[in-house]
Amino acid sequence: MCGFLVNVPATGFTQAVWTEQGVPEHQELRAKVKAEGPKLLFSDSPEMVYETGILYRDTLQGEGRLFFHHVNGTSKLKKLAIIVKNNGLRPVNFTVTRSGIDGPSHDYQAVGKKSQEYYFEEQKSKNSTLGFGKTLELLGGEGMLLPTDQLLTGTIDFFSDRPVEVTVLMCDPKTDVELFSALAKQLPMDEHPLRGTFVKADLNYKLQHSIDTEAGAGYALLLADSQTGEYLRGTDATTGLPAENYGNYGVIYNIDYKLKGDKPYELWLNPWGGMFAGVGVLEQGGQRKIINIPESPAFGRLGEEGFCIARLEPNSEGRFTWSPPGASNLPIRLFWLPSDYEAPYLHD
């Protein structure tokens, strides 16, 4: 049984291991998927940065989102900075609508998880006006210091009423980031092609059919899997080459579901791809709840574990929102299971 009712403060949690019997018997759910939302700038290659330079750069207008994930791979202290620049003649109104940043730290999964917790929290917009040639640095105004082998990661949503150039860079601690951005060289990717610009970075899933709770069956939905064709495709703006977002990092998933019947169900998450540490948001009955997945630092070493997110009331509908966390593995599966489901090897 699940550790808490939706819309009621959590008093515990339930985690299960399914190694002997396998994951619960289930029917695969189908959903209609609509891609919309901001243009995504994805900066994760090189992940381990061994020299100073430009990590990613592109120009965009309108709704934007930046996901960055970089480790200082040098033996000396460095600085990571994000520069927004107006190269046009007319003033730009630039607004950061939402952000979640964490680090630096050696605990990469903890940083990825905490940055999502910050991102999903309620927050106020931050407005700026940039004149011709003016810049704005998004990590505290001057960049953030990054010690050796430590990670800094985050997601920043923004809106610009005119084109702006966005640059992610790493430089020495005392370097003028604005001048460096104008003169530094573009660094090549590492062996993992994880950078690019992608349109419509919100994926909205609507289950094609209501979940029939009277049948007492289990249901599952596979997400962020390389075989489903859902990984965003775009362009590496620094090279002009095609790009694919392996893992859909920086993509927001919204899953709308509806329960039909008088029996309560539970929503579970299975980290099928391996170790996972993230955050989700459950909305139901006018309430919004941020949930750590799992409550412990991470789980999923076996790929056959489950975390009970919430108990869902009969004849209810809701939305579950999540995003692939930096340093976690994919894909995942969501399970809708009867509330009297007895999970093996429970950890409370």
Region spans (language model):
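C-terminal functional regions that serve as terminal interaction/effector modules
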Residues: 12-20, 259-348
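A eukaryote-biased signal for short, well-structured alpha-helical docking elements
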Residues: 15-57, 191-230
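Asparagine-centered strand-capping/turn motif at beta-strand->loop junctions
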Residues: 70-76, 83-94, 98, 158-160, ...
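Short, solvent-exposed loop/turn segments enriched in Ser/Thr/Gly
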Residues: 73-81, 150-154, 249-255, 316
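Short, hydrophobic/aromatic beta-strand segments
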Residues: 79-81, 90-98, 166-169, 264-271, ...
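Short acidic, flexible loop segments centered on an aromatic residue
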Residues: 89-112, 266-278, 282
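Intrinsically disordered, low-complexity Pro/Gly/Ser/Thr-rich segments with frequent PxxP/GP/PP motifs
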Residues: 111-147, 286-317
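Terminal connector regions
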Residues: 145-182, 325-347
